[in-house]
């Protein structure tokens, strides 16, 4: 019987495992007032201002997609994070491709870790690629983090090619926090330049919890 080919081993996931969410800087005041980043289906009816940067069509699909593990529900019951920066969604926002164009100086990254979420006892799931991808696999056990292609999640090139037909899907692997993500679990805010950092620091000046604010130009286009 022929020996099966040796499959390449998956890289060991980073520990701690960073997760990244992009938001409009104008929304930081609302997040601070609420003390949480809320999932779309669980936003308080408090009338506070919110500037959306999402794709309406994609958001509608996420509202219909059942989550097959963990706390269940649908994708919009969760706060979404990526496992790496420089997402295809940020590129679309930067270029205005089928979404409202927003200058990247107005976009901040909220950075936490998988371990912080799990340690706080929050419900979560994660996908090995974009959750809307036909073959996306859902997990709720951190022992399965090696199913995520972290090399692709952190790659600067993510376009689909004949050699890498699912690279764009894998770049968008998601970590989803059920219902709400406490502001206290955000450990870093990344921005594109010093002016944006000054703006964020001004907003955070009155916050009890003040994550570090850093200029991360390589996270942007």
For each predicted feature, which ranges?
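Active-site-proximal loop/hinge segments that shape catalytic or ion-binding/gating pockets
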Residues: 1-82, 87-221
């Amino acid at each position: 019987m022929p020996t099966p080919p040796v499959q390449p081993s998956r890289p060991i996931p980073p520990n701690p495992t960073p997760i990244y969410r992009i938001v409009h800087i104008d929304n930081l005041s609302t997040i601070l007032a609420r003390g949480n980043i809320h999932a779309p289906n669980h936003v308080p009816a408090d009338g506070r201002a919110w500037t959306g940067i999402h794709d309406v069509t994609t958001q509608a699909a996420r509202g219909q997609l059942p989550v097959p593990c963990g706390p269940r529900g649908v994708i919009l019951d969760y706060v979404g994070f990526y496992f790496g920066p420089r997402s295809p969604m940020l590129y679309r926002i930067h270029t205005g491709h089928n979404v409202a164009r927003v200058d990247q100086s107005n976009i901040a990254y909220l950075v936490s870790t998988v371990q912080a979420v799990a340690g706080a006892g929050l419900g979560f799931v994660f996908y090995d690629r974009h959750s809307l991808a036909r073959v996306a696999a859902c997990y709720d056990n951190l022992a399965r983090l090696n199913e995520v292609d972290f090399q692709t999640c952190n790659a600067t090139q993510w376009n689909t090619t004949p050699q890498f037909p699912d690279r764009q899907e894998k770049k968008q692997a998601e970590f989803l926090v059920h219902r709400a993500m406490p502001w206290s679990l955000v450990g870093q805010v990344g921005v594109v330049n010093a002016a944006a950092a000054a703006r964020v620091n001004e907003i955070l000046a009155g916050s009890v919890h003040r994550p570090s604010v850093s200029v991360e130009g390589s996270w942007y286009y």
